[in-house]
Amino acid sequence: MAEVLTLSTGMPATGMPSVGRSAAVADPVSEFGAEAPVARSVYLDAYLAPLRPWLDRESVTEILVNRPGEIWVEDAAPRGGAPGMQRLSLPEMDNRLLQRLAEQVARISHQGINREHPLLSATLPAYAGQSGARIQLVGPPATRANWAMAIRRHRLLNLPLDAYDRGPIIPSRETPMPDAMAEPIAYLREAIRRRRTILIAGGTSTGKTTFLNAMLAEIPGDERVVLVEDTAELKLPGANGVGLIAVKGELGEARVSANDLLQAALRLRPDRIVLGELRGTETVSFLRAINTGHPGSFSTVHANTPRGALEQIALMAMQSNIGLTRAETLEYAASVIDVVVQLDRQDGRRGISQIAESHTLVA
């Protein structure tokens, strides 16, 4: 069945483009599991024009927008600089332009984008002989006021097998970790530096969110962090990051779950993903996200012991029909999560009661 689009020439009071869709029509992204292709149009070209210098460079792989007036570009061969992510001023790239770009991408990819449907994924037309780039757009109310965008371009390189030869493979020899019992803070700082995935466990009012913010502050400022939470309580550790907000669907707004946002987060080029709290079906998506190239991620869970935290995660994962037994699910969770930090409150004081490496909890 074809997507039914309702296009308006004006802008609604919310400031979002009025591009809706029939509730009876399936989302092409969720139905087919891939971004919808986008036909080329003069309007799309006009809205992408400020990004043309980077879209036309073969060495550029990522173009990111976190806030108005600037972009972040990952360039393997920049002019006059070192390879990597660079922050660039681009005054034209404001929320209004991103709204219009989202409207165009939605229209010609047969999708919807408005405050009820603030997530949009698509594949842009091919430019300069390159394969089509993938674009992810996230708008309010699923963000902290501003639009977020990521364009990922594939570099097509023809390299011989010999190009991957760096000589004999030497096993990595990391220095020992600090003792978690004697030096818990030094241990955690080193675990964060080494990109260990950390789960914070504790009961109600044990300070899990406050502690999570303290850990976020230890992440190196040059790493890109994507936050996923119900309310904006977490603090981005650096300039290159974005916060996504789950929406419950009240007052005619979007119903966007943490699971939906995790799928979008994977397309926003994160170094680390931080999920405010594991509660249900998003557990499997979080574990898979970590296991597919995002180590060093964090989350929290309600549990009274480190072993109980892994048991809780296994239970929530099994409710998603993961297809594994309880023992297999527990082992999988322990293989993905490196460290469990247990918090408690004694005599009104919150603190760390235990730090456990996950593999010791299921042995």
Each predicted region: which residue ranges?
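Conserved P-loop NTPase
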Residues: 331-363
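P-loop (Walker A) phosphate-binding loop of NTP-binding proteins
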Residues: 191, 201-204
